[in-house]
Amino acid sequence: MSAAANPSTATNSASATSALATVAPTGRGSSSTAAALIDPALERALADVVAKEAALLDDGRFDDWLTLYADDGRYWVPLQGAAQVDPIAHNSLAFEDRLLLTLRVERLKNPRAHSQQPRSRCQHVLQRSALVEAADRDGLGHELRTPFLYVESRDGEQVLLTGCYRHWLVEVDGTWKIRLKRVDLLDADRPLPAIQLFI
């Protein structure tokens, strides 16, 4: 996992970065009226994407996992957890576009990768996903939140992380794609061990 936001990422998509910089930690609909507007069928469809993503990662099917991301998709792990608003003005544990994600996948597949001898394995345990709001109000897509436990194991040692996923999903040619996956770790501000795979 990269130790800070990669400078090249910031120049790849100015519009996406501008939108991401406005992503603030907010709660699900603040009224019963907002909750009533949530479409259960839409919520299930989006939750299925999140569950599929976790299953592909657990199975080590990284190429298939990449196809779940939109062309301008991002993977973001804030250094400050849920309190962090901006991925550019403040360092992040990871802030990666499709190109950087693809490079990481290629490294994991490389039989000469020293950090993968023996290979890392992972397990995602998800709670029920919840659609935050019925409408796509910020242009990023529909936001879904999913509390999680993540276990990564390698050579007899395990790492346990917990937190909440925030996925923004958009419909592309009739298929739901991940525009942004934000991983808010519960203890993001403490020293973390090296994570080889994707949380």
Regions found by a protein language model. Give the residues of each.
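Short, cysteine-centered beta-strand-loop-beta hairpins and adjacent loop/turn segments enriched
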Residues: Y150-L160
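Short helix-to-loop capping/linker segments positioned immediately adjacent to catalytic or ligand/cofactor-binding
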Residues: E53-A55, R112-R119, D155-G156
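Flexible, surface-exposed loop regions and adjacent strand-edge segments
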Residues: Q84, L197-I199
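A solvent-exposed, acidic/Ser-Thr-rich amphipathic alpha-helical stretch
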Residues: D71-L144
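Short beta-strand edge/turn micro-motifs at domain boundaries
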Residues: M1-A3, G139-R145, T162-A194
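Short, low-complexity N-terminal intrinsically disordered segments enriched in polar/charged residues
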Residues: S2-N12, A16-D71
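Short solvent-exposed loop/turn micro-motifs enriched in small/polar/acidic residues
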Residues: A47-D48, C122-H124, L160-T162
